[in-house]
Each structure stands twice: as C-alpha cells, then as structure tokens.
Amino acid sequence: MSSRDKQDSRKKEFKKSLDSETARRKREENSIGIRKNAREELMLKRRGIVQPNPSTSYQIIVPPEVQEQFQKYENETMENKIKNLPGLVTALNSNDQAYVYSSLVQFRKLLSIHAYPPIDQVIECGIIPKLNQLLQCNNPKVQFESAWALTNIASGNNRQTQTVMESGSVPIFIQLLCAETTDEVKEQCAWALGNIAGDTVDSRNYLLKYGAMNALIPLLHYGEDNGATTTSANSERKIGLIQNVVWTISNLCRGKPQPDFSVVSQCLPAINELIRIENLPSEIYGDLCWALSYLCDGPNTKIQAVIDSGVVPRLVKLLEYPDSIVFTPALRAVGNIVTGESSQTQIVIDNNGVELITRLLAVQKKSIRKESCWALSNITAGEPSQIDVVVSNPKTVTTLISLLSHSEHDIKREACWALSNSTNNSSTKSIQTLVRHNILKHFIDLLNSQDLVILKIVLEGLINIIKEGEKTKTKTGVNPYVNLISEMQGESIIYDLQEHQSKDVYKKAFELIEFFESSDYSDSENSEPNINQNGQYEFSSNYNSNSINI
C-alpha cells in the first residue's frame, strides 16, 4: 500500500498580503497526510479469503471418489501441495468437468491463503491462459472460481499483477460485467479490476482505455432487477457487488498523474444517487467519499463538476458519520472543495460545514485534527462573510486557539494558518472577537518558535490585527492592539526579530515596529483607553459603533 508522505510543502509560498484566492492552499501529493484505506479490507489490492455463497443454480456434480481425491490434496502440508501442483494442472486441463472444477477450487484456495500465498508457483504452472479460457465458459460457478483465482494473483506484487493484465484477462472481465451472468461473477470481476487499477497509474489508464468505468457504472444501481422479489440473500449479494464496484471505481479515480477527468467524472451521477441511500455498509460510503476526494482534487473546474452533481450536501453530512472510515475520506473531499473559489466554498458553509469540521477538531486521531485545521484555513481564506461564520462560532475559535499551545507541531502550524487567515480581509467584528479570545497572547508566545513558517504566519496575523486597530486610532488617537501587544511584552520580541536571519521575518518585524514607533501609546492617560470595573478596555463614545471589549 502506498502512503502520503507527511511533509509540509505548500504550492504557494506565504505572501505578505494575502487575498482570498492566494491564501487558499491546495494540497500537494505530499502535503497533508491522512492514510487512505488504512483497514485491510480497503487496501488498494485485496485478496478473497472468505468463501461467499455463490448461486446454486449451476451445480456441478462431483462424484464422491473425486471429492475424496481432492480432499486428500487439500489436507496435505503446503510443501506437499506445491510439490503436487503438476498433478493439479493435469486435472485442470482434463476433459472431465468434475476434475476441472475441483482442481480450479484447489488453485483458488491456495491463492487465498492469508499469509504468503504461493502466487509465483501458481504462475509458473502456466495456468493463467486456462483460467482465462474457463472465465469465458457459460457456467457461472466455473467463471466465479476462475475470476477469484485471477483476482488473487492480481492482488500480488507489480510483476504478478502485470502477468494477469498482459494475459488478456482485462477485456474478459469487462465483458462479463456487461454480460447476463450472476452478481457473484460480476463482483469477482470488479474485484479483479480493482486490484489491477490499484497497481500502477499505467494499469489504471489501461483499464480506463478498455472501458472499465463505463462497464462498472450501471452496476451501482441499487434497485430491484427486472421486477423480481428481493430476498435477504439477493440484497446481500447486491450489496457485495456494489461494495466491490465502488471500491474499484475509487481506484480508477485515484493516482498521480490524475486520470482523464472526462472519463472518470462520468461516475458522478451514479455516486450522487448511491450516496444518498441510507443504511448502506460503512465501506460503501467510505469508498464513495474517497472517489469524490480524488475527483475534486485539482482545478476549480473539477470541484465545480462535483458540486454540479448535487452530491455536496450529503457529502458534508457524512462528516458526522460515527465511523472514521467514512468521515476520514469525507473530510478529505470537503477539504478539497474548500480550496476552490469562494462560491464553491460557500456550498460547504451553507450545509453546516464549519460546525461539522469543528467537531472533528476534537477527534483523537492526529491526522483528522490536522486535516480539519487545514480545511478551516481555506475557509478563512475566503470572503469576510465566510470568515465571520468561522470566527462567530465560539467552539471553532476556542478550539483553534487552544491548539496553538496544546497540540503537536504540525497541527499547531495548521491552526496558525486558520487563525492568521481569519485576520486578513476580515471584518472589524471578527478581529474584535479574535482579540477577545486572547489571540494576541497566543501569537506573541509563538514569536519564539523556531519554525519559520509559523513565525511568518503569526507576524502576518499581528500586522493584520494592528492595521485594524489603526481604524480605531483615527477616532481615538490610540491603536488599542499596539498597546496590548506592548503590555504583553510582545514589542521587545518583535524588536529582536529585526535581527532574524530570515529576510521575510525581519521585514515583517520591521513593519510591525513602525506601528509601535508611530503610535503615541506613552502619552497621557487621556490618550489611552480606559479600563472599566470588569477589566475591559473602553473607548470614547464617538467610537461606539465599533467599540470592543477585550
């Protein structure tokens, strides 16, 4: 399984003056790390281990003596099974259907061993062409076992997977997805294609070229087939088919370089229809969200295509799903959407996205808290009204500020981004709210950080806050935020930062010092804000409309 490196590279360097678009930070491949498909059942490649219950309408009669012969083989040690593979190959190439089927089952069982299945030894037997031949017979039980064996070979390493792909199995799998055969056979073919798609980008593109996506999409339909009565067994089989189809589609949508969007985006209407259905297995919702996260990872045109599908309200709702295998990819997808234009971000906000993302800040898993901060930082890089939504949520601001002093370093950095962005292009009310939540003290504490990114983010935030205070100064003669920073011993730290080796840091420090030197904060008491009995700063009545309590 591949994993995203946990680095902190950014597509866009921090800039002194951030507008609502440049402040948004697109995720690079190595940027923010949430482990995709961490559970064994959702690996990029999977092997069938547990025997499902295939249809009994195509029974193959195996005489007792043949059953006994193959049962004896099954009871052998692995070493003896490998030694006796030539005999199993002979049986597979027999003209006797009972021998062919029984040997096929034994090959499948060998390949389904949980640890270290003998994939290479089976490949060396040269049976893959025979498996492809059996895959095209008109007995679904034989097709099923053949597809299962090929699926497990394709679950191996790159060379083993390529052996299946190069043998000509792919067109047969795709043909069977569209054929009149059982759901079990289709499920196994979809599973095999998912293993191949998860191998390499070239393999993924090969499947897309052969029309795998177009063959898979119709199988996402969750209705009754041909008006037949739906039984519990039928429903369970349909769920199994859909689960594997969704997983395979998610593998077809993932990877860098990204697949042809015009091809993979065709699944969006079907995803929108399926994701709205209640009480499906968590794995289905999880893979649907992963597929969406891949589809909206990129230019705003891709984000808009996902939005236009109508899926966003349900996607945001899944942020409150109780299982992490769902809310993890849902957060990834929502996080990608809010990297878009302000109008695209607004769709998430309008569906209670800020509140639901805020709840995830309390999740124990570090990567979820980090991703949540990252998503909020892109929302606070938006319009003033969007910043107001974040800042006016007491839980959001309180938690973000708490993370500045009580979290791991990389989470602290993301929280810094979210809060610093909220000081830029924001309303007077939002700045006042942040100051009331003691953001100045936390920013000043971070001025001692050895992380250059944090230093620059914090200094930018302080500059934005002080610039807001200049509006007050025009009315009262005093910039209240300059005073507060000075009283918190922030001024001396900022002075020292003028000697910093980083050009960006000392330039920002110098800009801040200019505000201190131009402020007459050491004048008489009349030029200072009064302190009321609650220890709050008050300003003259002519500043009533913008008064603040700190």
Swiss-Prot record:
- Biased composition (Basic and acidic residues) is annotated at 1-30
Identify the residues that the record assigns to the IBB domain, covering every copy.
1-56
**Primary location:** cytoplasm
Task: Note the SUPFAM superfamilies from the entry.
Answer: ARM repeat (SSF48371)
Which parts of the chain are ARM repeats? 116-155, 158-198, 201-241, 256-297, 300-339, 342-381, 385-424, 428-467
Does the record's keyword annotation contain Cytoplasm? yes
Kindly give the SMART domains that the UniProt entry links to this protein: ARM
Which UniProt keywords are given for this protein, alphabetically ordered?
Cytoplasm, Nucleus, Protein transport, Repeat, Transport
By its UniProt entry, which Pfam families does this protein fall under? Arm, Arm_3, IBB
Tell me which domain of life the UniProt entry assigns to the organism this sequence originates from: Eukaryota
The record's Gene Ontology biological-process terms are: NLS-bearing protein import into nucleus
User: What terms describe the molecular function in GO for this protein?
Assistant: nuclear import signal receptor activity; nuclear localization sequence binding
Q: What is known of its domains?
A: The N-terminal hydrophilic region contains the importin beta binding domain (IBB domain), which is sufficient for binding importin beta and essential for nuclear protein import.
Q: How does it assemble?
A: Forms a complex with tnpo/importin subunit beta.
Protein purpose: Functions in nuclear protein import via a substrate-importin alpha-beta transport complex that passes though the nuclear pore complexes (NPC). Binds specifically and directly to substrates containing either a simple or bipartite NLS motif.
Q: Which family does it belong to?
A: Belongs to the importin alpha family.
Q: Which PANTHER family match?
A: IMPORTIN ALPHA (PTHR23316)
Name this protein carries in UniProt: Probable importin subunit alpha-A
Q: Which lineage do the record's taxonomy fields give for this organism?
A: Eukaryota, Amoebozoa, Evosea, Eumycetozoa, Dictyostelia
